[in-house]
């Protein structure tokens, strides 16, 4: 693989360094310079929410890893789903349509275009997809249904921004479906759908599994890709931890955010 006609420089660079080799780069300067453009926020969030959401969405940082600490759930992770919904609400209000330079209008057509070109949300598990859809319904009255689905449904698709939500934070569950949860190909496809911004949610236990996992060659390759993502964001950006006490049901939960800057 050489030229890439989709992703900006930061997103291409991660794929180049980890999988495709240094020749893999944006086909043109215009593609390489793509970034999301956000209008100023129309409404104020909860204290704590605004800062956390703003830090994750900052257009100057195209690749963001969000690691939830102190959460133990199996295939459905309500805290992660609620965070994804809040990020989505902020993007729906603020993300501008590259065609018009204006935020997507608050109409059925606006919702359709937002989910067609602006954002989609990827999750490996139907339980987590259901949890995200439930939380999305709670943050806004959508006139066109949100695009939340598995990576298989996203192949060949692209959007300005993508949110990837793994959800699974129970090690036994992850080990039971290791080749699925730790599929390097699935993670790679998820990471290479967006043109300008990719935000990945990985609960801490997935990044620190028991040693049994490395005996499975395919799963070990996927874990290595997750750890490479963490390292890439650390080396090329900055890290900050947020207390999620402002969220319902998230007492004691922390979110470590690593974001790789625009290259």
Q: What is each of the regions a protein language model found here?
A:
Residues 12-18, 40-43, 160-166, 257-261:
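Short, surface-exposed amphipathic charged segments that create phosphate/polyanion-binding patches used
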Residues 90-192, 201-209:
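Conserved helicase C-terminal RecA-like lobe
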Residues 4-9, 33, 70-75, 153-157, ...:
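A short acidic, often aromatic-flanked loop/helix-cap motif at beta-alpha or helix-coil junctions
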Residues 26-134:
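Conserved helicase/translocase motor-coupling segment
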Residues 1-37, 192, 207:
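Conserved coupling/interface region of RecA-like P-loop/ASCE motor cores
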Residues 5-8, 12, 81, 85, ...:
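Amphipathic alpha-helical transducer elements in NTP-driven molecular machines
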Residues 137-140, 171-263:
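Helicase C-terminal subdomain and adjacent C-terminal extension
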Residues 1-5, 74-77, 122, 180:
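Hydrophobic alpha-helical scaffolding
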């Amino acid at each position: 693989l050489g030229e890439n006609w989709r992703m900006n420089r930061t997103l291409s660079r991660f794929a180049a360094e980890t999988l495709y080799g240094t020749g893999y780069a944006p086909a043109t300067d215009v593609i390489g310079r793509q970034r999301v453009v956000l209008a100023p926020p129309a409404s104020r969030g909860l204290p704590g929410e605004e800062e956390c959401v703003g830090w994750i969405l900052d257009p100057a940082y195209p690749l963001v890893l969000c690691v939830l600490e102190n959460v133990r759930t199996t295939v459905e992770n309500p805290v992660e789903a609620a965070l994804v919904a809040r990020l989505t609400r902020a993007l729906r209000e603020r993300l501008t349509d590259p065609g018009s330079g204006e935020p997507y209008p608050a109409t059925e057509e606006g919702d359709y275009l937002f989910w067609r070109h602006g954002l989609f949300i990827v999750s490996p598990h139907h339980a987590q997809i259901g949890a995200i859809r439930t939380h999305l319904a709670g943050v806004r009255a959508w006139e066109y249904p949100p695009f939340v689905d598995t990576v298989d449904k996203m192949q060949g698709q692209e959007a300005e921004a993508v949110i990837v939500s793994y959800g699974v934070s129970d090690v036994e569950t992850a080990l039971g479906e290791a080749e699925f949860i730790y599929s390097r190909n699935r993670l790679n496809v998820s990471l290479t759908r967006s043109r300008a911004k990719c935000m990945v949610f990985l609960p801490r236990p997935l990044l620190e599994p028991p040693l049994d996992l490395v005996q499975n060659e395919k799963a070990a390759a996927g874990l290595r890709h997750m750890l490479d993502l963490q390292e890439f964001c650390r080396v090329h950006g900055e890290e900050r931890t947020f207390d999620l006490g402002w969220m319902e049901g998230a007492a004691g939960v922390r979110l470590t955010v690593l974001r790789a800057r625009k290259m």
